Amino acid sequence: MASAMASSALREATCTMTRLAADVAASVSSIFSCKDSAGPRPVVPATKTTSTPLDVMFFTWFAKSSGSSLPPLKVVMTGATISIDSTRGALKKLARKGIKGWLNQYMATIKEIEPIVLYEQETDARWASYSILVRVVTSDGRVSYGEAVPTLRILPVVSAVRQTARAFLGRDPHEISAAFYEWYRQDFFLSRSFESATALSAIDMALWDLKARELGAPLYELLGGKLRDRVKVYANGWYGGCRDPQCFAEKAKEVVARGYDALKFDPFGPSFNSITSEELRRAEEAVAAVRDAVGDDVDILIEHHGRFNANAAVEIAKRFEPYRPYFMEEPLHHEDIEGYRKYRSLTSARIAMGERLISAKEALQYLVEGLVDVIQPDACNIGGVTGSMKVAALAEAFSVEVSYHNAYGPVQFALEVQLSAVTPTLYRLESFYDYWPQWKRDLIGDPFRLSQSSVEVPRGPGIGVAVNERVLEKYRAEPSEIPVGEEPVWVVRGTWR
């Protein structure tokens, strides 16, 4: 009985696809202004779909009836190369949009790339008051977003996005790698530009999101499939206003009570380049107070912001050894290679760094020399999804953990959750999420909920969240520079004493 039903369904499917093939052939001929006197070729049973140049189009159709799986069919026709991954869904889509409209989606180009500055004054960090989203619009009206770095560079970054966009406008949005190398040839080859790199990164993010949404799949599926359903995170941004050990300890307890089992903080106040005995004593007291407050089962991570010379960094590492920090982040500026070599030879501390790197080739030097234990690529700097995956692959080859730097905004956060889901050597993802102003969370619908120091990986298409256009328009602002004050823009507000 089941066999008869299957055969009947197969005959019906063959007839349906033959008629569909004729319609598509006519549409393709009109779009490409080409004709084929032979007409559509016959339906041929096949076990898989292959891809060829524009003179051949394949449709793969899996017919299902009464729970029976039928052999896939392949319809070979003149025209362009297109794949349909489901039967009824694809047919319904074709019926709704029309053959020509559906095909136009696959021939769309990048029509517009727009940097959008968002702002609302925030109490705990001046850079957290800003976001720079980059909106990519295709010629058929699809929209996606990436995110760029705002710190101290609002106007230069906005200008760089507009300049970098020239390498992408009019191109096929699917050709992400080709667009990257065109950008490299046009805009980057003769200079090392942070602004250009963050502009590229934001556009790359948006194009990957766009491609995944087009396929109806979460981004992690395009990157090989997820390795974990939940991503472990650590808290940052929680210690605003802390200048004494008691404040750090009390707020650290609140972080753990919220559900985190790892947290990062900068205990160094206004120390810069060198550190006095008194400054080191106060920093040590803060670290000791946090360790005592959270116990031995919580990872504490020490943020240096890359601001010490090698001698000071080594002295700090030795003083902090009794408190067992999981890693020491950016004890020196990333350009101080000799300083990192000295630090490695004189301390046993795990080194975390990488947020300032803008290419996989830069990351490679630290990996080859064994100067990093936890590498921290930032998707907003390193080249978006494309650059992040290159660094993650290198990290796996060198048995180095990955912890994506993740400070700027909700689009970056959602995208790096997807990246973290597929990264083999993941340590944790950085999270300011619970300590951002509410508007940043509302920008993507505030979907992430902490449980056991982790967040669930969204299963929706693309990066798994959608930008709320109403919230975006509410906080849209004219590009302007972040004012420079006594307290540097990169610190958590109120900690520079």
UniProtKB/Swiss-Prot annotation:
* Catalytic activity as recorded in UniProt: D-gluconate = 2-dehydro-3-deoxy-D-gluconate + H2O
Query: According to its UniProt record, which cofactors does this protein need?
Result: Mg(2+)
What InterPro entries does the annotation carry? Answer: DgoD-like, Enolase-like_C_sf, Enolase-like_N, Enolase_C-like, Gluconate_dehydratase, Mandel_Rmase/mucon_lact_enz_CS, Mandelate_racemase_C, Mandelate_racemase_N_dom
Which residues make up the annotated site Transition state stabilizer?
A: E430
Question: In the record, what terms sit under GO molecular function?
Answer: gluconate dehydratase activity; metal ion binding
**Pathway where it operates:** Carbohydrate acid metabolism; D-gluconate degradation
Active site: residue positions: H305 (proton donor), H405 (proton acceptor)
**Keywords, ordered alphabetically:** Carbohydrate metabolism, Lyase, Magnesium, Metal-binding
Q: Which residues bind Mg(2+)?
A: E303, E329, E355
What's the Enzyme Commission number for this chain? 4.2.1.39
Provide the top EC class.
lyase
Entry note: cofactor: Binds 1 Mg(2+) ion per subunit.
Family stated for the protein in its record: Belongs to the mandelate racemase/muconate lactonizing enzyme family. GaD subfamily.
The task this protein performs is described as:
Involved in the degradation of glucose via the Entner-Doudoroff pathway. Catalyzes the dehydration of gluconate to produce 2-keto-3-deoxygluconate (KDG). It is not able to use D-galactonate as substrate.
Give the protein's recorded name.
D-gluconate dehydratase
Question: What organism is the protein native to?
Answer: Thermoproteus tenax
